[in-house]
Amino acid sequence: MNKGIERGLKELDIPYDTFFYQFNDWEKDDDFLEQFHAYLKAGNYTDVLSVNFSPLISILCEELGILYTAWVYDSPIHIRNTDSLKNSCNRIFFFDRGQAEGYCKNGVNAIHLPLAVDTDVFRINASKREKESYRTDVSLVGKLYQTEYTYFTAPLQGYTKGYLEGIVNAQGKIYGGYLIPELITDELLARMNKEYAGVATDGFKMGRRELEFMLACETTGRERYMALALLSGHYQVDLYSTDEDKRLKNVRYRGYADYYTQMPLIFSQSRINLNISLKTILTGIPLRVIDVLGCRGFVLSNYQEELMEYFNAGEELVVYENIEDLFYKAKYYLEHEDERKQVALAGFERVKRDFTFRERLQTMYGEHK
């Protein structure tokens, strides 16, 4: 997103400087606090903009009386202490409306803003041979979400273990709804921690947020595994990930993919690009979907409420309702090349027109500043 944001700021003639820092810990880094404090004081800045929310930036901006604008594309926000979300200097734009509404109810200045794509950034002049090396029927770029679910459930008694398995199975059958938080009760956590106390010597306790995230990742991981296993039995399937699952013997593992130099070729040369969202995304359109469309790629995605609001499903991208539906829709579009290309082109035209960084930045700095 960084290149797109910078190009958008230039288009709008908004002057800016960039500050790069590699965090060791997003929530505790004295070197960063010292360096960025001096940088802000020397530059006489009125606003700080970051991709995703940084507690340390918020703390500094609160102290110096500077507006802090964050654009979040992650769900959930990966911070342990959420107190800084309520700082008065913050304007936090969330790609996920459901997430924004939840934070708003808890006193956070949370605003819904879908993500964007700069189609020119992804334009690559690749040779025919280079393009051919990325050609495949189906591809997935992302994690397999191999969790420690088995490790953490192993010490639990049969009833508790079965209840957790029931949560994962129930969530796996629901598309367009997020059940996990409602099913994690105080009674469940108390029972789990009582059972852990009987075997753990380090005083370990499972927290609500940790359990919710683990179950969401486990559910997502199972869905991704099933999709890849099913499709790879019939078509060439490529996986771009640092993860590997030896059970997926028919999947071609391609390793890590660079965001700017490889992903545009992956998305444009894959006949079908899968989007299987992490279950913690309540309503929002993941960055992966918008990036694929911005590279003229064809998207086959799970249901997300905002996908249906911002796109014409079946015309600009395709949405599946369950794993069986995913297989049959993949089969259909792999057998109907002209329709597949037509959908991909329409999706590209949609994001090029309606998902620009210029428009999103105008929302940030026009209506809200």
Regions found by a protein language model. Name each.
Residues 1, 108-281, 304-305:
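Nucleotide-sugar donor-binding catalytic core of glycosyltransferases
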Residues 1-65, 209-213, 237, 357-369:
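N-terminal pre-catalytic "stem/leader" segment of glycosyltransferase-like enzymes
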Residues 1-24, 86, 90, 97, ...:
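Catalytic binding pocket for nucleotide-activated donors in carbohydrate/polymer assembly enzymes
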Residues 35, 57, 80-81, 261-262, ...:
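Short acidic active-site motifs
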Residues 52-53, 72-76, 97, 115-117, ...:
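Histidine-centered beta-alpha loop that forms part of the nucleotide-sugar donor binding/catalytic region
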Residues 61-76, 91-94, 139:
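Active-site proximal beta-strand in glycosyltransferases
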Residues 62-63, 84-87, 131-133, 232:
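Short, conserved loop/helix-junction motifs that constitute active-site signature segments
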Residues 76-90:
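Membrane-proximal helix-turn-helix segments that form the acceptor-binding/catalytic region
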